[in-house]
Amino acid sequence: GWIDRYFSNVKKMWEKGCSFTVELMPYDGLIDDIDEIINLCKSELGAACQITVGRNDLTEKKDLLTSMSRKEYESVWRKFDSTMFDFKLDIFQKKIDDFCYAGVWTLYVDLGTGASKPCYGQLSNQNIFKNPEQPIIFNPVGKHCRQPYCYNGHAFLTLGVVPELETPTYADIRNRVCEDGREWLSKEVKDAFSQKLADNNEVWDEKKKNSYERKYPFIFFKTALYDWKEIYNKVIRKRKK
């Protein structure tokens, strides 16, 4: 069946030296299958899969995607002993107040269109495919995150877009050590994922941060205007036709 084919493909990659990770989106309909899922992953891949934390994007605070209380949700899914799950719950609905370097140290690019933005949760501010001769805009989020919390912090925060925060490494989030000692990440990938972005990028001093903060209202206005035009051209104009 499809599940057998899935695990067969993952193991083929592993046998050829590729790094991999297997991740599950936990939802209430899977609760009765938890033991079976864990045992299947251990049998096929030597360890239980990592699990994320589901969110309800239809709610203002992006609440947990579950009918259970947070305490019940945590108790049920802790069985996977997942570093990803633990960290995502730890940062759940906690607003980031420190200066965030997403946008200057990171860039989210839609490979289908070229639309780009600092991270998943911010406004689009450019298209790097339409005008490849133009310099890429690298503007940090700073202290102006639009989201109630960093819902994909398992990637951005662990890589260090907010250097002041103590977090696991991205390798901790993605790797698993099997019962026989093998690991899902190769040494090279594990070493790369264990770094922090501050190791190889400029950390701004307070003077540079303050200068950026003074310019931010103008940057935001320009970004909002660009993002609105993108939405108009893609959605509203298309509907009118």
Predicted regions and their residues:
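Flexible mid-to-C-terminal extensions adjoining Fe-S/redox cofactors in radical SAM and related proteins
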Residues: 115-241
